[in-house]
């Protein structure tokens, strides 16, 4: 039987607390190490998902039309949005949580600030990890928000 990755950290916290309350400190070590490892993985995942590099592997998003509806709804609220591209990113850390890259393009005369990209990222469906990038004519002017 395989342990569900999403349950690993909460279960480790419960067992650590249980053994600690019983003063069985030698049994606590295993769960303390598991909690430390989970915290390290979360930190590495945040770093990995916070930027898009040239060698990163992008895959089809794999979402059904019904699963895309919240994405469409979130993006339709932003005036001047011309196009958007969504891809799933292949990640090394926390693979159970899908990581996406969303590239948005606005009308030519629209100024795109970091706060606007952050608003777009915040309006996306809950429970997803998505890097939002602005596509501009000049490569060096691209901005990104996690």
Task: Identify what each model region corresponds to.
Residues 9-12, 17-71:
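Surface-exposed beta-loop interaction hotspot
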Residues 43-47, 53-135:
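A contiguous, surface-oriented mixed alpha/beta subdomain in the mid-to-C-terminal portion of proteins
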Residues 145:
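Conserved small/polar residues in nucleotide/adenosyl-binding loops
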């Amino acid at each position: 039987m395989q342990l569900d990755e999403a349950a690993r950290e909460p279960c480790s916290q419960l067992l650590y607390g249980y053994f600690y309350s019983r003063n069985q400190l030698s049994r606590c070590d295993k769960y303390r190490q598991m909690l430390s490892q989970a915290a390290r993985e979360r930190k590495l995942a945040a770093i990995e998902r916070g930027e898009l590099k040239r060698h990163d592997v992008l895959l089809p998003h794999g979402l059904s039309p019904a699963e895309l509806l919240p994405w469409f709804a979130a993006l339709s609220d932003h005036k001047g949005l011309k196009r958007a591209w969504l891809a799933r990113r292949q990640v090394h850390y926390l693979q159970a949580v899908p990581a996406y890259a969303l590239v948005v393009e606005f009308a030519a005369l629209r100024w795109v600030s970091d706060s606007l990209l952050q608003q777009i990222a915040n309006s996306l469906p809950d429970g997803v990890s998505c890097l939002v990038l602005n596509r501009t004519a000049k490569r060096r002017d691209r901005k990104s928000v996690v």
